[in-house]
């Protein structure tokens, strides 16, 4: 009879009894997962939720009625009427024996091991192990300590318990096969293939999947204990993919980035570029105080109020003598949605300029189809076209999703140069029913042509455009562009693109420039940027770090780094994700949303909110139904109001 509260009987579920408790679970579920559903913990080392079971550690052995011997819970699937016991005398004795064997040669490194406090061997020994060992401590086998495998990873073979996770990670997740098992039997060791250094762009995941302290981060060596860290959920700031992370900080500094599993985005993996970018957020090279730098006169640090008053006075002067169109505004793909929402309102509604952008090149007309392919949807495609882009550089973790689609789901992945004719691409696909096209922003038009060529023969053709910056997609959604308003509505008064704004400033036609946030995209402008900055009468910079813009600004207002403020960002597929403040700001200046609100008030706006990020977020969602429907963690889609 089904357990109380369980769904009705059907062929896809079975009834199982574990430690006297009945539960209904899918028939393809492992005993390990069925026990977890009841809150019953079964210790294990080799099993990992993202990898296939191998049952090599033998820690998860359980008793199953009608089976002649104990069975591994990580590799045994449930069946109807199965009765499992996880803690009888036989099971307990075997667990104690396995732990005793694992500790025979394990060093007494806990006080100096970087895994201390988050080590499964340490935890399970206390919880399930014997009170004492029958083996003498003096007979332990020793190896070289802390052998560097790369600039990021160290290996301590004395601590290795041969769970095979690292080997399987390279076999199943990345396909790079950089770590192998050497020797056989009791001589078995984990090492890099042929002793070569690790070259993978995803090696930083190794210490996270290692259940002990055998593989550790060199950057985190002897830095902290987990109980001394303050953990904050965030989003990786290195690219537009939107990998979820935990930011661990201590003593007002970021100590490490740790993956935070989101199966719809990152599948719990991080790239090394993102994981090891955290030292940049501890940099002492910061803009800390407001300052004014008149074209003639002496630069000086001032109060925030004086800096904003000076900025508004300079902007009003340009508007009065020329017009609002004599002001150019630059946003940044590093800013939050809330900041970008206010910036485009400030530009269009208060200053009166259509000249606003966050990039240099013109933004071509948007096709709603660019938003249809979600990251998780990649696995459901029969064929994938990677068009003229290198995910390894633009969005590294995307390559792991492509590998999974190809090697676990059977999809065919075609990497195609941007110049290949659309009909040739269609011929290569060969009539696959479900097709995904992945391109970067420079190849959007070609991606559209390929989609049209494939549309007649495929049941579905969906596209994903890789944007630049942590919030490049958000900047476009929210209208930080010269030719479209928020929600991709066509502007009745289109302005100049970023490069054209700089050209006009260098020619003396644009007299004032307002910059919000660091903007690496401007570096491609070369000396044009410097000529524009020198020629402009007023340059207002709200920024976090010294830059060429800050160097030539007439008014500088400190900004908050992405780890120092709350808000939201939108990833490459349109997923709106919340970020939280992890560190105290390096400046006493309030967050950019409050600075922009105050500046708008100085320029004559009367209907703006307080600048509180939550209030700005509410106003933004009220104006954009797609963002309101997306909520926190959903996708903002612009195809007939659909939201996934």
PLM region descriptions:
Residues 2-15:
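Terminal leader/tail segments of proteins
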Residues 29-33, 61, 336, 497, ...:
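Short, structural beta-strand-to-alpha-helix junction motif
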Residues 103, 107, 156-158, 162-163, ...:
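Catalytic alpha/large subunits of respiratory electron-transfer oxidoreductases
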Residues 16-17, 80-87, 191-195, 558-560, ...:
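Short beta-alpha connecting loops at secondary-structure transitions
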Residues 2-4, 58-237, 241-245, 250-253, ...:
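Fe-S ferredoxin-like electron-transfer domains
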Residues 21-29:
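Short, contiguous acidic and Ser/Thr-rich linear segments
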Residues 31-65:
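A basic, amphipathic helix-loop patch mediating RNA/tRNA/ribosome contacts
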Residues 108-140, 146, 583-639:
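N-terminal leader/propeptide and maturation segments of large enzyme subunits in energy/redox metabolism
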């Amino acid at each position: 009879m089904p357990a109380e509260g369980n769904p009705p009987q059907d062929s896809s579920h079975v009834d199982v009894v574990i430690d006297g408790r009945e539960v209904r679970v899918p028939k393809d579920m492992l005993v390990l997962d069925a026990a977890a559903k009841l809150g019953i913990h079964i210790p294990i080392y080799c099993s990992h939720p993202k990898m296939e079971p191998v049952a090599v550690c033998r820690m998860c052995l359980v008793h199953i009625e009608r089976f002649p011997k104990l069975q591994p819970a990580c590799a045994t699937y449930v069946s109807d009427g199965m009765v499992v016991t996880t803690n009888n005398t036989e099971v307990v004795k075997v667990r104690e024996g396995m732990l005793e064997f694992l500790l025979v040669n394990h060093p007494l490194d806990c006080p100096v091991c970087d895994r201390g406090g988050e080590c499964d061997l340490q935890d399970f020994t206390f919880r399930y192990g014997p009170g004492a060992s029958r083996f003498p401590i003096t007979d332990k086998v020793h190896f070289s300590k802390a052998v560097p495998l790369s600039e990021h990873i160290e290996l301590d073979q004395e601590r290795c318990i041969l769970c095979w996770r690292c080997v399987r990670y390279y076999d199943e997740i990345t396909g790079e096969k950089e770590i192998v098992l050497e020797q056989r039997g009791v001589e078995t060791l984990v090492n890099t293939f042929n002793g070569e250094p690790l070259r993978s762009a995803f090696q930083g995941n190794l210490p996270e999947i290692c259940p002990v302290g055998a593989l550790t981060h060199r950057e985190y060596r002897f830095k902290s204990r987990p109980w001394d860290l303050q953990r904050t959920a965030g989003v990786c700031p290195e690219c537009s993919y939107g990998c979820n992370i935990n930011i661990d900080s201590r003593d007002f500094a970021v100590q490490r980035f740790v993956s935070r599993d989101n199966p719809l985005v990152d599948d719990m993996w991080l790239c090394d570029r993102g994981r090891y970018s955290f030292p940049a957020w501890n940099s002492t090279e910061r803009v800390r105080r407001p300052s004014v730098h008149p074209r003639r006169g002496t630069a000086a640090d001032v109060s925030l109020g004086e800096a904003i008053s000076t900025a508004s006075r300079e902007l009003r002067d340009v508007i009065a003598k020329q017009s609002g169109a004599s002001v150019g505004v630059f946003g940044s793909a590093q800013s939050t949605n809330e900041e970008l929402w206010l910036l485009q309102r400030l530009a269009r509604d208060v200053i009166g300029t259509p000249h606003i952008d966050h990039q240099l090149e013109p933004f071509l007309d948007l096709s709603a189809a660019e938003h249809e392919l979600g990251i998780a949807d990649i696995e459901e495609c029969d064929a994938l076209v990677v068009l003229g882009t290198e995910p390894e550089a633009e969005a590294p973790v995307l390559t792991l999703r492509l590998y999974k689609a190809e090697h676990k789901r059977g999809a065919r992945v075609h990497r195609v140069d941007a110049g290949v004719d659309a009909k040739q691409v269609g011929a290569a696909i060969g009539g696959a029913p479900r097709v995904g096209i992945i391109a970067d922003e420079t190849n959007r038009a070609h991606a559209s042509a390929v989609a049209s060529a494939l549309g007649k023969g495929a049941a579905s053709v969906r596209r994903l455009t890789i944007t630049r910056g942590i919030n490049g997609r958000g900047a476009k959604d929210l209208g930080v562009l010269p030719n479209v308003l928020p929600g991709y509505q066509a502007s009745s008064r289109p302005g100049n693109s970023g490069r054209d704004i700089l050209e006009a400033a260098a020619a003396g036609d644009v007299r004032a420039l307002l910059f919000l946030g660091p903007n690496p995209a401007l570096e491609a402008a070369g000396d044009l940027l410097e000529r524009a900055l020198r020629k402009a009468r007023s340059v207002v910079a709200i920024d976090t770090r010294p830059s060429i813009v800050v160097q030539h600004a007439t008014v500088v207002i400190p900004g908050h780094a992405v780890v120092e403020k709350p808000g939201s960002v939108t990833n490459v597929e349109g997923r709106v994700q919340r970020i939280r403040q992890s560190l105290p700001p390096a400046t006493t200046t309030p967050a950019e949303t409050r600075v922009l609100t105050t500046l708008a008030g100085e320029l004559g706006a009367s209907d703006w909110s307080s600048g509180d990020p939550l209030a700005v977020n509410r106003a933004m969602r009220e104006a954009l139904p797609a963002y309101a429907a997306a909520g926190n963690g959903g996708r903002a889609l612009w195809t007939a109001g659909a939201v996934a």
